[in-house]
A protein has these predicted regions:
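Bacterial N-terminal signal peptides
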Residues: 8-16
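Domain-level marker for long, solvent-exposed, non-transmembrane regions
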Residues: 3-6, 20-110
Length: 110
């Protein structure tokens, strides 16, 4: 019982940390990295994002925003640049008034 309480307390402490603290503790070091130009990129780790919208452009923007938000939350703002990411893919479906898009990319930072 005591071990469970200690584990629960540690989990609550980690979950309560701001994303900058997570990055400062090296959570991005869980993945191997490679240099691509002036960037440092995750070697084989992809992040995904999905979104919907009334137009294809809005659905794509929502998918990119989801990718940015999750990546920055997990590794910190420096990793949350979709413009810096590599190996990007985007797929969309639907039609006028109801589009859905998904994107995948390897995070990079400058």
């Amino acid at each position: 019982m005591r071990k469970s309480l200690v584990c629960a307390g540690a989990l609550a402490l980690v979950l309560g940390m701001p994303s900058g603290t997570v990055q400062a503790q090296g959570m991005d070091d869980l993945h191997s990295k490679v240099r691509v130009g002036g960037r440092v990129c995750m070697a084989d780790h992809f992040h995904d994002g999905s979104g919907t919208g009334s137009t294809r452009a809005r659905a794509q923007a929502a998918a990119i925003r989801a990718w940015i938000d999750f990546t920055a939350w997990e590794y910190g703002g420096r990793w949350g640049s979709y413009g810096a990411a590599i190996s990007k893919s985007m797929s969309c479906s639907g039609g006028p008034g109801n589009y859905s898009c998904s994107t995948s990319a390897r995070p990079c930072r400058y």
